Amino acid sequence: CIATEWLLEDVNINKEYSIREYFAGVGIQATLLQNMLNVKKHKVSDIDLECFNQLKEDKRWESFKEDGHKAILDNEYFDIKMLDFPHSSIIHLKRGKWSNFLGAFISKPEIVCWTDTSMTYSIKIHGSNYAKELNTNKLDSYSEYFQAMSDWLYNQVGYSLVKVAYRAKNAAYIKAIKGKHTLIEKSFPITKSNLGFKIL
């Protein structure tokens, strides 16, 4: 995914990284990470049996069939943690399907990336609900939404958002690191020629 590549383009390629993916699907993101980074350890998992069967065919990573949401609480240390949620918003992260989310930060990873799909709807539809969750008066744009999310995350675990990559109106890919940082945003339109992906 071109958006994910941009998120991690500033990672030190001369350093070895351990990577943990909790919702690895069929391994698209895992393949990208293997090609981008100097990987010393790579653990991937998915709850779906067909996805797991495909993942385990590639020996570049360790594959497990497990519930990624529960596995977040295992408190394993990895330099980079990837949470490619099939759907998510701040509501899911705080008190919904992915409410174990903050557990990903307990082991103090260098980088945590995740997917947010709230932008499939206009901010006018759910913005008031998101504003309540983030303890702010109102949200008029997704830029404001992610800035408020960054502030919330910093108050919770001492990490903040440094990059948000918008893949058209389908999803946002988020990168957080320790400390308080200025958020950088970039949009990646989907075209007929690449659909937001490139061949490796």
Task: For the regions a language model picked out, list residue spans one by one.
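Conserved SAM-binding loop of SAM-dependent methyltransferases across substrates and taxa
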Residues: V26-N38
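Rossmann-like AdoMet/SAM-dependent catalytic core
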Residues: R20, E144-L200
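A short, conserved alpha-helix within the catalytic core of class I
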Residues: S88-A104
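Class I SAM-dependent methyltransferase SAM/SAH-binding core
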Residues: M36-W61
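S-adenosyl-L-methionine
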Residues: C1-N14, Q29-T31
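Conserved class I S-adenosyl-L-methionine
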Residues: K15-G25
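Conserved beta-strand signature within the Rossmann-like core of class I S-adenosyl-L-methionine
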Residues: P109-Y121
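Short conserved loop adjoining the S-adenosyl-L-methionine
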Residues: K70-N75
